[in-house]
UniProtKB/Swiss-Prot annotation:
NCBIfam families: rplX_A_E (TIGR01080). Belongs to the universal ribosomal protein uL24 family. One of its GO terms (cellular component) is large ribosomal subunit. One of two assembly initiator proteins, it binds directly to the 5'-end of the 23S rRNA, where it nucleates assembly of the 50S subunit. Located at the polypeptide exit tunnel on the outside of the subunit. GO terms for molecular function: rRNA binding; structural constituent of ribosome. This is Large ribosomal subunit protein uL24. Transmembrane segments: none annotated. The keyword rRNA-binding applies. Residues 128-152 are annotated as: Disordered.
Length: 152
């Protein structure tokens, strides 16, 4: 996903920091677990409140929990059970970057999210069908399988 057309790091960072919130949501993509990937046919989806995630990197690696809150401004999410204590012993959630988690259970209570999954699944299936069709025609020297069988 190109944030800007410039290759300069300073302009890349500037575009990231000044990105509007409705576009910043795209930065929350996280991979799905193997089971979910096979079930829905999608590799990545944006993390939402209510999803269950597994932390894959950092001090909290291996922890699983429900996403409690998402901070679009800081591009961080907060997971249930991942907390630190402040000096006065009050617990606060530890911020985690969405690229460091894997979604293990989706919250499909939103009909729009189901539509997104269906749309992405359809794109993937159509790409697979196109690849199969091109491989069939390339094997027979530009002829389809039916044409080559008719010549025999």
């Amino acid at each position: 996903m190109a944030i800007t057309y410039s290759s300069k790091p300073s302009k890349q960072r500037k575009a990231l920091f000044n990105m509007p919130l409705h576009l910043r949501h795209k930065l929350f993509n996280a991979p799905l677990s193997k089971e979910l990937r096979e079930k829905y046919g999608v590799k990545k989806l944006p993390v939402r409140k209510g999803d269950v995630v597994r932390i894959m990197r950092g001090d909290w690696k291996g922890h699983e929990g429900k996403v409690v809150r998402i901070d679009l401004r800081r591009v961080r999410l907060y997971v249930e059970g991942v907390q630190r204590k402040k000096a006065d012993q009050t617990p606060v959630y530890y911020p985690i970057h969405p690229s460091k988690v894997m979604i293990i259970k989706l919250d499909l209570s939103d009909k729009w999210r189901r539509k997104i999954i269906e749309r992405r699944k359809g794109l993937i299936e159509s790409e697979v069908v196109e690849e199969k069709e091109t491989s069939k025609t390339s094997e027979g020297g530009g002829k389809t399988i039916e044409e080559t069988e008719g010549e025999k």
